[in-house]
Amino acid sequence: MFLEMIGAMIITFLNLTQTEKDTKMSEDPAITTLIIAATYVAVVGYGESSGVVTGSPYNPAAAMGLFWAILFQSNIDRTEHIWVFFIFSYLGSMLAVLLFECVYKKAMNMSHR
C-alpha cells in the first residue's frame, strides 16, 4: 500500500513539474518526455525491487481502467482488493499536488527572485 502511494506521488509530482511552464527542467519536448517516462520506469522498478510485486499501475486513472476491464469481463471476484489501487494512488497524487503547490512552487519562486 505504501509503494502505491509513493509511486503515484513521484509520478504525479514529476508530471506537474514538467507540464508547468515556470517549473520545467527543459524547454525541449523530447527531454521533458524522457524525464516523465524515466520517472515511470524508475517507479515501476522501485516497486518490483521491494520483493512484493503488486501489479499496481501507480496511476489512478489506469487503476480505474483496470477495474472496469475486469468488471466487464464478468469477473467480479478479482476486484475484491482493487480499492488499494484506488485509495492509495489517489492519496499519493493528492499529496504530490500539495507538495508541488505549497512547497515546490513557492521555493522555485523564491529562488528566481
Model-predicted segments: where are they?
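Membrane-interface helix-loop junctions and terminal tails of multi-pass membrane proteins
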Residues: 1-113
